[in-house]
Amino acid sequence: WKARPGQKGRQPGLPKAGRSFPVMYRDNTFIRAGRNSVKLKVRIRNTWDWVDVELDKHDVDYIALHCAARNELSPALRKRGKKWYLDFSFEEKVILKKVSLDTQLVLGVDLGINNACVCSVMDSKGTIIGRRFKKLPVEQDSLERALRRIRKAQSNGAKRTPRLWARANGVNQDIAVKTANFIAGVANEFKVDVIVMEHLDLAGRKRGSKRQRLHHWRAKSVQKMVEHKAHRCGIRIRRVC
């Protein structure tokens, strides 16, 4: 921009702060001051200084109840909306099951658009032991209504509809969470050793009458949540084409 002032360009500036910041390393920028309080080292009043932060009692009790046997990692400072949050991560070591092929129980999962999922449990000989279906008609209707409102607003000339999109994304996330919880529940019910899911390639342009529903289909998000839940229970994950 200095060598060629006639061309487009401007002077580079400092990067703007985003919504996710680096990890607050322990004893460097993060100190446990008590059970319900911590100290964070942040840049305030043109200097680096320690700030006392009080933790929510309900969050502390939840961590003490469900994460007592896990290793607490360094937290991360993130901004959601107009508020700042301190996100804690926990590490847990799990040994996956080692079962011979003759005695393995496999859970096959078929994710769909109309039905949330179909789960089939079979043994090594191919005998179907159990089958479960998951339908979410109320959530699907809510998603359809949210998408119709977005289409109507866009046809009337509205370029940005953040509230309508927030509603649709929230319903879509709820569908993904309920589907993943159902699959994990079926796996624990039948004590399966492996969960098999289809490798879905959702790249490219969507065509057809259901292209909008296919575009908002969060199949990979469901598979990721199922993978985390299965590994915590010692269950292996396989994907087939």
Show where each model-derived region lies.
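Acidic carboxylate diad motif detector
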Residues: W1-R80
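Positively charged, helix-rich recognition surfaces that bind polyanionic ligands
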Residues: K82-C241
